[in-house]
Amino acid sequence: MARKPQVRATTPARRESILKAALDCFIGQGVEATTIDDIVRASGSSIGSLYHHFGNKEGVAAGLFIDGITRLNADLLRKLKRCKTAQSSVRTVVTQYSDWVTAHRDIARYLLNSRDIAFPPETKDQLREIHRSHIVEVFRWFGPYVRDGAMKALPIDTYVPIISGPIQDYTRYWLAGQVKESPAKVKGVFADAAWNAVRG
């Protein structure tokens, strides 16, 4: 009788399990203090599998950041493209960010607190391209609203800080335990402020 093949995690599933374990370790003890062995134990993977997917701990940290920011951007664009007006679009940028952070606290905390991680040059280049591509998509969406006067014509680099900056700051304070009210309770305040700042 032929032996049944052993069920093993597929490559995407293994990669995902390593990233999830790494996130737990990074949040629990910090990126610097986390070792490769910590991630291997937490994920149940082999060290060979980790090196195959990511190369080293810095590669895991970079992969986790890229994965998180890509999901955040994709979720925003998906919601944004359901909007019918300038007002609903601006408000969605704010409320979707708030909702995403609330639903994905650990990865949001990692994204917001990863500024000091020494990503390799190729990761920095990839992140710049991800950011550029995302901003192009967002501005392509809002461009017609600016042209038809529904939104103010402002210097292009000011829209993101005006619309997204305040809610990003608030969620950072909330994740750090510096403010009490959850973003869900105050997102409407920030959405109103963003719309009032850019409405035509």
Spans of features found by a protein language model:
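Generic hydrophobic, amphipathic alpha-helix propensity
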Residues: R14-A22, I39, L64-G68, L72, ...
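Amphipathic alpha-helical packing segments from all-alpha helical-bundle domains
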Residues: T70-N73, L77, P121-D148, D157-P161, ...
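Helix-turn-helix
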Residues: A13-S17, C25-G59, G63
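Short helix-capping/turn signature of helix-turn-helix
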Residues: F54, N113-F119
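N-terminal intrinsically disordered/low-complexity leader segments
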Residues: M1-A13
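Hydrophobic alpha-helical connector segments
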Residues: G63, L77-A103, Y159-I163, K187
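Hydrophobic/aromatic-rich alpha-helical bundle segments in the mid-to-C-terminal region
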Residues: D106-N113, K124, V146-A193
